[in-house]
Amino acid sequence: MTKPIVAIVGKPNVGKSTIFNRVVGERISIVEDTPGVTRDRIYSSGEWLTHEFNIIDTGGIEIGDAPFQTQIRAQAEIAIEEADVIIFMVNVREGLTQSDEMVAQMLYKSKKPVVLAVNKVDNLEMRNDIYDFYSLGFGDPYPISGSHGLGLGDLLDAVVENFNKESEDPYDEDTIRLSIIGRPNVGKSSLVNAILGEERVIVSNVAGTTRDAIDTEYSYDGQDYVLIDTAGMRKKGKVYESTEKYSVLRALKAIERSEVVLVVIDAEQGIIEQDKRVAGYAHEEGKAIVIVVNKWDTVEKDSKTMKKFTDDVRNEFQFLDYAQIAFVSAKEGLRLKTLFPYINQASENHKKRVQSSTLNEVVTDAISMNPTPTDKGRRLNVFYTTQVAIEPPTFVVFVNDVELMHFSYRRYLENQIRNAFGFEGTPIHIIPRKRN
């Protein structure tokens, strides 16, 4: 299921970031256990009344044609385009301004649900000053105080009321849902076209469950696939591509609806920080992943080139040590057939279940080879392990004290489970839980 996207927009200094932080709370904290995943995002997850959503902060929009302002306005337009609901924030202390009216004009054109939030209403007397904002034409303004947290519940009530009910997944459970992600200009569109080209049977273009996404169904070697949001991957435009933090919103929607994600990198340019950031989105969503090294035809090669590049990928993507690596040239159509066994294996392992008896034998043997750690004289005791979920495979380990299960030992158990059962292409989650 795809989480709705909520965008906070408005002129500078109306308190957008304060409200953003209020909504996401502690969800923006850094997870230390995941090396290599950069976290300088302007979006995070929020939840209200059992509704989960992604929320994004945008730069302040002002009147003017300075290059910096032009870029901020372009970024905000992208955020508005990708959002399902928009929080339009204004500042009661400044009153209604030309910048507010300019933002309102942008929002009229979007035809998206807009919830008007009047910030910095820090006391009851200031509520009398919100009525000027009715003229913006977005219905009742919601008075809030970001600094004090006042009125936030009513605001979020209005936001979630605008969420559309999710459509059911229209695809058969045996159909592999696939998305292609990567930073700009790594050849995503070329890979889409190559996959859908010769020897592939395109079944149909169907509307996806996400607004204005087009999914493409196709078959290869007896297996059905659906490529999520081919329209989004083919989308062009320098402004859209240059604003990476905002254009990633569409990729997030595709990732959430996917089972297997192809992370595309450029063999010619090598691996940069942005590649790791893009891959991190899919990893954190628990998706099966195949790393695709594209433009392999542009690299001068000898007998050791592929081994060296593989080592570089493993070093840079340490958090994706489970992902298979495919070397292809989408433009030339080279080595594309190597992709599909990796995709199929990743999908199969993403849904794999293992027997509890065999699983516990593996864990017992692992503990015999490497005894559980101690801390201040107390030893970690592992009582029982069971698989509780698939997509991704998730295991609960019942222990005497969760604090004694350090990350390094959890990773050790994960590696032993992988060695025993495979799980190539998919993350697996190990969750320690105190036995009652």
UniProtKB/Swiss-Prot annotation:
The lineage, from the top, is: Bacteria, Bacillati, Bacillota, Bacilli, Bacillales
Task: Give an example GO molecular function.
Answer: ribosome binding
Give the superkingdom in one word.
Bacteria
The question of whether Metal-binding is a record keyword is answered with no
Assembly and binders: Associates with the 50S ribosomal subunit.
Per UniProt, residues of the KH-like domain are 352-436
Gene symbol here is der
Please state which protein family the record places this protein in. Belongs to the TRAFAC class TrmE-Era-EngA-EngB-Septin-like GTPase superfamily. EngA (Der) GTPase family.
**Name of this protein:** GTPase Der
Amino-acid positions noted as binding GTP 2 in the UniProt annotation, renumbered to this chain: 182-189, 229-233, 294-297
Example GO BP: ribosome biogenesis
